[in-house]
Amino acid sequence: PNSTKVVVIGGGVVGCSCAYHLAKFGWKDVILLERDKLTSGTTWHAAGLVSQIGPSAPITKIRKYSLDLYKELEKKVDHSAGLRLNGALSIAQEEGRWQELKRQATTAQLYNFDVQILNKDQIKEKIPLIKNDDLLGGILMPGDGSGDPSGITQLLAKAAKGEGARIFEDSPVEKILIKNKKIEGVIVNGQKIECEYIVLATGMWSRQIGEKTGVSIPLYPAEHFYVITEPINNLPKDLPVVRDFDSRTYFKEDAGKLLLGIFEGKSIPAFDKTNKVPENFSFGEFPENLEHFEPYLEAVSYTHLRAHETEADLVCRLLLE
């Protein structure tokens, strides 16, 4: 195409969602450009946790809308989002956390979400593999769970096309054209595409792209980790997602294995030697860093999870901060 009204740059879950919603609400002349393949940036390796309650009313409304949308689009475009709504359990070791979780439960009730406040014995009954000695309690959201990030992205992309948006893979944007502080277009594979608006949905590349256009985007990638164990016998398929904010960990069932992730307070900056994300970092991973992950793994193994005699594969991922 030689021209369009809107160019969405980036074919992850955010870019495909933007393309779908723009087209859905009347912006029919929408093009999405992905430099490689859809999901190849950071979407493909996301843990895919799905929750309804957010830190604020607007975020809670967005999360509820998103989950309802995925269910609706699955029927409309006949593509799976990989939803597994087995519930999500947030647990507390400390009194402050316990009070916070109970406030979240009150908020959930205000939005008519199904929520259960559990004591430590009820938690043990619900999830036997949790060691509950030091727990004060937790809240269970039966409507939460997980989804397939790649499946959700493809679902949104298919829905966007159905609304008239056009999606092009293997189409790296080489330059954003600006004149008199106004967007004029983009250069893709040596070809100019005129446009009036650009939506930047480029994840960890956003800061570098912004710098080229004189826009400061305060975003920097950091290494992020999760572990996937070898298969565990008799691991329940309907195991809820468990979040332990005090230990900065979460875990969920993953094809008969256990996926254990962390949300560390201080992450390791990625690409700190070059201070630049490589252009060709598609479906990329980092080398193992057991030294960084081990303290979290030990805390979980001996505090909340029985030590399973399984060999764990460390998978190094990205977290945008």
Model-predicted regions and their roles:
Residues F25-T42:
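Glycine-rich FAD pyrophosphate-binding loop
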Residues I9, I193-G203:
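Short hydrophobic core segments
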Residues A47-Q52, A88-S90, T213-K237, P295:
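Central beta-strand plus flanking loop segment that forms part of the substrate or channel wall
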Residues T303-T310:
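Conserved small/polar residues in nucleotide/adenosyl-binding loops
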Residues G143-N189:
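Helical element adjacent to the flavin cofactor pocket in flavoenzyme catalytic cores
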Residues N2-T4, N189-Y197:
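Core beta-strand elements of the Rossmann-like FAD/NAD(P) dinucleotide-binding domain
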Residues S3, H79-S90, Q104, K124-E163, ...:
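Helix-loop-beta segment of a Rossmann-like dinucleotide-binding subdomain
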Residues A47-K126, R248-F251, A255-L259, G284, ...:
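Dinucleotide-binding Rossmann-like beta1-alpha1 core, especially the glycine-rich loop
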